[in-house]
Amino acid sequence: MKVSMLQSVFSCVLTIGTAVALTPPVPIPPPDKLEENVFAALADSSQSETGIAYFEQYIDHDNPDFGTFSQTYWYNATFWKGPGSPVILFTPGEIAATGYTGYLTDATITGLIAKEVGGAVVLVEHRYWGNSTPYEEQSTKALQFLNLDQSVADFVHFARTAKLPFDKNGSSNAESAPWIWSGGSYSGALGAWVESLAPGTFWATHSSSGPVQAVYNYWEYFYPIQQGMPANCSEDFSAVIDHVDGIFLHGSEEEQADIKQMFGLQDVPHGDDAAAAISAPIWAWQSIQLYSGYSTFYQMCDAIEGFAPNATALKYGDGAVGLEKALPNYAKWYTTNYLPGLCESYGYDDWQGEDNILCLDTYNASSPMFMDWTESNAFARTWAWMTCNDPFFYWQTGAPEDRPTVFSRLANAEYWQRQCELFFPQEGEYTYGSKRGKTAEMLNEHTQGWHLEDTKRLFWVNGEFDPWRSASMASEFRPEGPIESTPEAPAILIPGARHCNDLRVTNADANEDVKNTQDAVVKQIAEWTDEFYSSGKGRRGLPRRS
């Protein structure tokens, strides 16, 4: 697939923290950050086609007089054909948007759509992330205005009223021009929820890997991983986890101390914390892209099976080596390649030292994990708020007893829910939603969750082995089964793909199924865009006004 000259001069920053250990991975799309010199050229204020701008957004849409905050957005109107032409909106969701400036270009599906339909790309930062937060301190009280309904209202208000610098006469606001939502992961689900809660605001929606169903006990997160990872590695990893759980549940104090020592976790007081920490490297699966090559996940599997790195003599199809070999093999890799410097990497004074493992104690209320209330905290505090408050939950847990598990069953839903109180202690009358009795069932009834079949011009894309597939419309656990493709709601399940693999052109360059999916999405969005103009709703490419 050919891309513009702009693509060739930026670097793609893709590492989503391989050292995941303290909290479950958040549902975010893969980062794609422009090099500084390229971004500086895009943000040059002397020209109007590209740049950075700010939108005064209501803090509380139910009470506009309460005040506003500055919501940051970036724009690229290089492909825009003038007032009345389409606008493609992308938000990375629950992360600062500065790492996603590549989504302004045709190195990503947003830019491909813009090029095809003659539209502009607008990258909007989500409330409470990056520079787009109304409060510097993320206290329980300050976070009261971070919820799904306020977030949906943000994008509706922006689409309808933003004075885009490249659109001098306002002819490209929603209703006057077709706005197209393209999002991945939470932002993919958010696009579907906007269509559910504010239908018609966006003319068309592309939702990639969107977990639309809130789930309290989300053991199903690991099911696609088990289906996609090498079978021998899955069998052996599961055997290790069962063994570790058995010791912490039924073993003597000496046996529990020995297994902690084996994994370098002798200073972790609680067995469930130690078991969760031993399980944590399985999370590396989510960040794999189709061009990732020899990723951390496969290095771990090689180590468990006793393969030398990049070995060719033995294949993943060979049988499992069994617990007797897998346990010491995994412990050696864990203590050599995974654990050293893990806590230190977060940058807090209390966690300095390569062998420091204090970060793994989730019972310590004074831990920086719970006490850092700044926007720049390292623990996705604001996302943790949404999981506890809306509540999305998505607590990633061990499988039921009648199924193999690759994550400790000691880290159950209550293990994660317990941490909500440590993250967000009550301040006067202010607390989080699930403490007030809100449930996943309530949220799903509000958004329609898995029952989003009756939508217009919404394109669903999922990866076969994406762990967030289990909460998506393509879920095998959906009572009606994975959604079937229709003309109004096309659906593609990409064979062998993981999380949001259709968003970046480099994945299409590496995989024909992804390329075909990107082509299908772009073609369908273009057809829907033509329908907007043919229906008389607006005029494309009105003369530009200076």
Please describe what each predicted stretch is.
Residues 201-326:
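A catalytic-pocket lid/entrance helix-loop region that shapes and gates access to the active site
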Residues 282-543:
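C-terminal subdomain of alpha/beta-hydrolase-fold enzymes, centered on the catalytic histidine
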